[in-house]
Curated annotation (Swiss-Prot):
Enzyme class: isomerase
GO molecular function, a single term: 1-(5-phosphoribosyl)-5-[(5-phosphoribosylamino)methylideneamino]imidazole-4-carboxamide isomerase activity
Predominant location: cytoplasm
Cell compartments where the protein resides: Cytoplasm
CDD domains: HisA
Keyword Calcium: no
Residues the record marks as active site: D8, D127
Listed name of the protein: 1-(5-phosphoribosyl)-5-[(5-phosphoribosylamino)methylideneamino] imidazole-4-carboxamide isomerase
Family the entry assigns: Belongs to the HisA/HisF family.
Entry EC no(s): 5.3.1.16
One record GO biological process: L-histidine biosynthetic process
GO CC terms, sorted: cytoplasm
Amino acid sequence: MLVIPAIDLYRKKVVRMVKGKKENTIFYEKDPIELVEKLVEEGFSLIHVVDLSRAIEESDENLPVLEKLSSYADHIQIGGGIRILEYAKKLLGMGFRRQIVSSKVLEDPSFLKKLKEIGVNPVFSLDTREGKVAFKGWLDEKDIDPVFLVNRLKEFGLEEIVHTEIEKDGTLKEHDFSLTERIALETGVKVIAAGGISSERSLEEALEVHRRTNGLLKGVIVGRAFLEGTLTVEVMKRYACQENNSVS
């Protein structure tokens, strides 16, 4: 099972936005480059990096940070405001093949195929709030069944998603794996769970779901709990070493 540390960028700083709300932004005195470098040295095969400035404000202010992070592109899945092919190509040119997409895919599912055609490995970000699908930096919602949506996107080549529980994101409350597990079992796509992966108990439950789904629950993303030390690197590594922890 993959255990994936998360780093959100806003105004060139490492942040967490509780429940995805800009007014609830927590800034951390951590250098994102040094943080990624340390995580790679610790042996994490994948790190989740999201450019919130671009996702929410369509700003390129974090681009200099991303350019520096490109040295570790093989260890990073990048997301945030990837809505046009030109920007996806720019990220690909930096070495970021694994790209997280959401809003554009909801508007135009064929965007998944277009990304694959240029060499991107797209992962769909399925962000849910009280059963509804959120998009555009979590500012808008669609009243659509997540399982139906994922099965629909499979027709366009979808193979993997990140499922985030927005109401738990950045709160240190426990993730509810019931919907995550249902999505995995009823669609057959690989799922990475996010939002509320806040304790060793969360990791234990994730590992159980990983086994029940025969590995379809591919892993979990740990954000605030990692940044604040609620989950230590040592504990995260211990769970990452169990079962299959391949990125592909």
